[in-house]
Curated annotation (Swiss-Prot):
Disulfide bonds: none annotated. This is GTPase Era. Residues 33-40 are annotated as: G1. InterPro entries: G_ERA_dom (IPR030388), GTP-bd (IPR006073), GTPase_Era-like (IPR005662), KH_dom-like_a/b (IPR015946), KH_dom_type_2 (IPR004044), KH_sf_prok-type (IPR009019), P-loop_NTPase (IPR027417), Small_GTP-bd (IPR005225). Residues 142-145 are annotated as: G4. Residues 216-302 form the KH type-2 domain. Residues 80-83 are annotated as: G3. The gene is era.
Length: 320
């Protein structure tokens, strides 16, 4: 073979079979449920990597995040939504509900996540919205690994299955990955023939800048008390790649509403903010695959969570 001749067999051997547009399937799957039921954990497990932050605290997810899973001819675009909840006392809560509701449009399948042990008023609210829609819904009964009595889970599932004509009722553990393969089969069955929306290597529609802000916010929730999650946000003021250091230089501004919260974030002798910064930097380096130089500041901005102008500048309105 001449040096400049293209070896098509070698190309396919190294790159795998290229999906042709006429054989492609593509569609959207909304992951919905009340706050803190495991939606982001499920998305991360399906994708095999972390794109949506998690914590034990409710309403960790504030934005609508898309995760892209491409397998040959099939591309599934998952939409992780903020938890739908009844209380809408603050502007940020109203916007989170609106972002979650707007995700329930033009989807091909819905995963409705509920807890494997109990049913709440917020679950009932989500169910009511789904009953009014025409979308096929798979009821995903999560956290079954936390229940010792198998009969208890089966009885709970039987009761919930009567609430709506579900495509299927699947017991899962988002954390352990139990029955993820069953969910994938349902996804394939509901993806229409359509050209892929994203290149094969894409995993999310969100930018690295956005992911950096979310990682810092996750560490804030992990290392601070229960009061902070609803009163803190993160704005990335600088996100630059420096070829000399072959790394990202990132400045993160942490906004809180009161001086007491600022002291809580900084900690005694600045120890807490150092821990938050260190842990965030390590996660960013793993995600971005490069060295990260992260600097963090804390600033008091009273009432930001009730100010729609401030929320718009911080990117919350863009989800609608």
């Amino acid at each position: 073979m001449a040096d400049n001749e293209f070896d098509i067999d070698a190309f396919f051997a190294s790159h795998g079979e290229v999906s042709s547009p006429e054989n492609q399937h593509c569609g959207f799957i909304a992951i919905v449920g009340r706050p803190n039921v495991g939606k982001s954990t499920l998305l991360n497990k399906i994708l095999g990597q972390k794109i949506s932050i998690t914590s034990r605290k409710p309403q960790t997810t504030r934005h609508r995040i898309m995760g892209v899973d491409t397998d040959g001819d099939y591309q599934a675009i998952y939409v992780d939504t903020p938890g739908l909840h009844i209380e809408e006392k603050r502007a940020i809560n109203r916007l989170m509900n609106r972002a979650a509701n707007s995700s329930l449009s033009d989807v091909n399948l819905v995963f409705f996540l509920v807890d494997g042990t109990h049913w709440t008023k917020d679950d009932e609210m989500v169910l009511t919205k789904l009953q009014k829609s025409n979308f096929p819904v798979v009821l995903c009964v999560n956290k079954v690994d936390n229940v010792q009595d198998r009969n208890e889970v089966m009885l709970h599932m039987a009761e919930m299955s009567k609430k709506m004509d579900f495509v299927d009722v699947v017991p899962i553990s988002a954390k352990q990955g139990k029955n993820i393969d069953v969910l994938r089969k349902h996804v394939r069955n509901h993806l229409p023939k359509a050209t892929h929306h994203f290149p094969e290597e894409y995993v999310t529609d969100r930018s690295q800048r956005f992911m950096a802000s979310e990682i810092v916010r996750e560490k804030l929730m992990r290392f601070t008390g229960d009061e902070l999650p609803y009163s803190v946000t993160v704005e990335i003021e600088r996100f630059d790649y420096n070829p000399e250091t072959d790394g990202f230089h990132i400045n993160a501004l942490i906004l809180v509403e009161r001086n007491g919260q600022k002291k809580m974030v900084i900690g005694k002798g600045g120890e807490k903010i150092k821990t938050i910064g260190r842990e965030a930097r390590l996660d960013m380096e793993e995600l971005f695959g490069r060295k990260v130089y992260l600097e963090t500041w804390v600033k008091v901005k009273s009432g930001w969570a009730d100010d729609e102008r401030a929320l718009r500048s911080l990117g919350y309105i863009d989800d609608l």
